[in-house]
């Protein structure tokens, strides 16, 4: 009996220590998975990075767990695209609004189609003007803003700049973050140049994609995106025929 009590006491003590360590651990929250590596390249292993929307889940139907909501309020910083509905709804409830970082700030935004549940243009990041989609079959009337800014290496450079600016404000004495950021920007600039060069050499004028997720990529590199999907619905036989005919003719 004595040995059993000692074992229970030690187990409880270890559990308390683990809980204390978890509470003391500095955590950053990221809204969607594509942003994780961007922020991680700057901060390295100094923070635990939590992603809100798990792999395979849809941001359009995502709802945070109670544990995630508690974690958000305890987080050092929260990085988000700033253009997806769940971000606007969820992050407006965060007590410390100053720790929420909008990574799309300053990017020239593109009007989205109604195939997405996106933040309306009037609620989108300041500093970006809506433009028509780079894809000819996309509706340009008011259905919000296309949020897929991270698909363009050119836009990623601005997102990295926004992330670093926020991190530097919070941790001005860390020279390591500046070094990491400069290395990241050099890599992104090289990727941008290489992408533009390869596309120019290929002579590609457009590409066909099921879901219109590469609008910023198409815009930034002077090509057109032809989406098979229309307004979030499966394509009709007529639409499929149009796309096939266009591909054959070109």
Task: Give each language-model segment a name.
Residues 8-9, 123:
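Intrinsically disordered, low-complexity segments enriched in polar/charged small residues
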Residues 10-18:
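Hydrophobic h-region of N-terminal signal peptides that target proteins for export
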Residues 2-8:
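Sec-dependent signal peptide recognition
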């Amino acid at each position: 009996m004595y040995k059993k009590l000692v074992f229970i006491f030690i187990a409880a003590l270890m559990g308390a220590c683990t809980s204390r360590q978890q509470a003391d651990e500095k955590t950053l929250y990221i809204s969607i998975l594509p942003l994780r590596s961007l922020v991680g390249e700057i901060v390295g292993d100094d923070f635990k990075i939590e992603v809100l929307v798990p792999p395979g889940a849809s941001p359009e139907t995502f709802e945070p767990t109670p544990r995630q909501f508690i974690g958000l309020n305890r987080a050092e910083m929260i990085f988000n695209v700033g253009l997806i509905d769940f971000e606007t709804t969820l992050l407006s409830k965060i007590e410390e609004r100053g720790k929420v970082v909008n990574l799309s700030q300053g990017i020239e935004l593109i009007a989205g189609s109604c195939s997405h549940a996106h933040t309306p243009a009037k609620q989108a990041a300041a500093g970006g003007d809506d433009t028509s989609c780079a894809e000819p079959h996309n509706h340009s009337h008011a259905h919000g803003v296309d949020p897929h800014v991270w698909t363009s290496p050119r836009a990623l450079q601005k997102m990295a700049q926004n992330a670093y600016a926020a991190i530097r404000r919070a941790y001005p004495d860390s020279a390591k973050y500046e070094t990491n950021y400069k290395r990241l920007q050099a890599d992104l600039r090289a990727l941008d140049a290489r992408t533009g060069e390869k596309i120019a050499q290929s002579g590609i004028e457009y590409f066909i994609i099921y879901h219109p997720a590469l609008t910023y990529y198409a815009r930034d590199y002077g090509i057109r995106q032809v989406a098979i999907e229309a307004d979030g619905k499966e394509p009709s036989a007529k639409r499929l025929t149009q796309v096939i005919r266009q591909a054959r003719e070109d």
